[in-house]
Amino acid sequence: MIESYLNLLIFVLLMVGTPGPANLLVMIGGARHGVLPCTGFILGLVSGKLCLNIVFGVGLGIFLTGQPMMLQVLKFVSAGYMVWLAAQSWNSSGGSASQNHQFRFKQGVIVHPLNPKAWVMTLLAWTQFAPELGTPTMQLLLVPLTFALVQLVFHTAWCAAGALMQRAIPQQQLLTRGLILLTIAVVVWALFQ
């Protein structure tokens, strides 16, 4: 079982650590507001993915992925939400003191349930790796907790990278707009995969 768990862990590290809509959004948050003000957003991202994993773990995900029309709607709603969330910082001129930023728990919690990349990685984790982890109870503990711990590390790191970039690039609005455009490009690319 240790080897099976290591396979899951490597998969999760690679999936969560690579650029995607959630990591780029949290990087924008870090660049705009710093790490500490985005803690709620990071916890929201982790909580949303935890819920998604539990839904898949109890079998509802397999049912939902068998509904192609629903998945198409999910993709477009997801893309629209992520573009909207990223674009909220387009004209923002405030730094970390900005009180009305959109990088809070309630915005973060719905990112992964609406994120097609999150659905694909969750489905793969449950179909390719979970069956080798023992009992359904063990699977329901290991898969969601592995994702949650890895997300806490990587989402915080992406947020910190955004904060560091903000310090290195004094033209904050230019940096923010560049990250927003990159996020939108990734979302549009993912939409047509």
Pin down the residues of each PLM region.
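Cytosolic-biased juxtamembrane loops and peripheral soluble domains of multi-pass membrane proteins
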Residues: 87-111
